[in-house]
Amino acid sequence: MLYRDLTLRERQVLGIIIQSFVVSATPVGSRTIARNYNLGLSDATIRNVMADLEADGFISQPHTSAGRVPTDKGYRYYVDLLMNVSGIDEQEKQMIDARFSTRSSELKGTSAEVLGAAAKVLGSISRQLGVVLPPRLSNAVFERLDIVQLASTRIMVVIAIQSLFVKTIVMELTAEISRQKIDDVVNILNERLSGLTLEEIRSTIGKRLSDCQSREGLMNSIVGAADTLFDESSILDRLYVSGTENIVDQPEFKQPQKVRNIITMIEDKFGIARLVDNALPSGAYQGRDREVAISIGTENRTDNAIDLTIVSSPYYAGKMVGKVGIMGPKRMDYEHAVRVVNYMAGCLSEALSGNN
């Protein structure tokens, strides 16, 4: 976003309005700024500065108040140019490390359990909505496939991806099949598909197994179901969200319609995934090998999220990339959100790589 150059006074006043509003959730007036902050400016001078900020769209006046509140533009200027992010609080660092450090005895369970726990910790520490998107699997490398025989004509296909994620699908067969034939098919599939990405498997499996299909009905069934078996989109069914109560308790969302909008949005897993995935990169903070992204209000481009801010960062599991983030009101402690999200992303990357 392009801005005119704000003067030092304007930057100071805008920063104070945002920081004060984050804490109080009430509009901020010039008298409050003059009384509580040592700017060396009179009440009248501060009023003039606020008038200029309002004229340029950085703050606005709610019709019921004499004070001012930040606009989306004001928040964006703040996170891009004024925000000062320091290191994570030591107590919060210890809380995350205790669960996700590769040296921690608590780091156990499946990757799904690790991601679910990450969402809970994020929601708890930030007092917002913690969100974790599992890694995209299209570029994930297939490791091995196993088949569990559930009945004479029913099997469960278990696909392991880089030892990090497991996908299971139950298939019904048209005829009975022996355990020996199942083992033969499993061996061929693992030999020919191991090391390929899911996308490569979907597009080439027919050619790679063309000499096998005529000899084995199960192989034909596997090839025919490849788009489902090796489809990465179903990973969004395992979106991890925690802390709904933190959002609905915020003063911004006390109106019944706003509560309904928030609940509707939270129940839409694909909608949340799009919002977190499309958050706008912020040049204000560059983490360890990751850039924290922040989308504010109307930047989210959906009516149910115009009152929300999304702070997110990528994490890595081998060659796969997922997203971890926080969703909350625009009246958010941005420095704190960025610190927590960035640190959690780093810990998840280390934890999932350590699980390899």
Swiss-Prot record:
GO molecular function, one term: DNA binding
One Pfam family from the record: HrcA
UniProt entry keywords in alphabetical sequence: Repressor, Stress response, Transcription, Transcription regulation
Keyword Chaperone attached: no
Gene3D superfamilies named in the record: 3.30.450.40, Heat-inducible transcription repressor hrca homolog, domain 3, Winged helix-like DNA-binding domain superfamily/Winged helix DNA-binding domain
Domain of life from the UniProt record: Bacteria
GO BP terms: negative regulation of DNA-templated transcription
Family: Belongs to the HrcA family.
Family matches, as PANTHER family: HEAT-INDUCIBLE TRANSCRIPTION REPRESSOR HRCA
Function summary: Negative regulator of class I heat shock genes (grpE-dnaK-dnaJ and groELS operons). Prevents heat-shock induction of these operons.
Protein name: Heat-inducible transcription repressor HrcA
Source organism: Chlorobaculum parvum (strain DSM 263 / NCIMB 8327) (Chlorobium vibrioforme subsp. thiosulfatophilum)
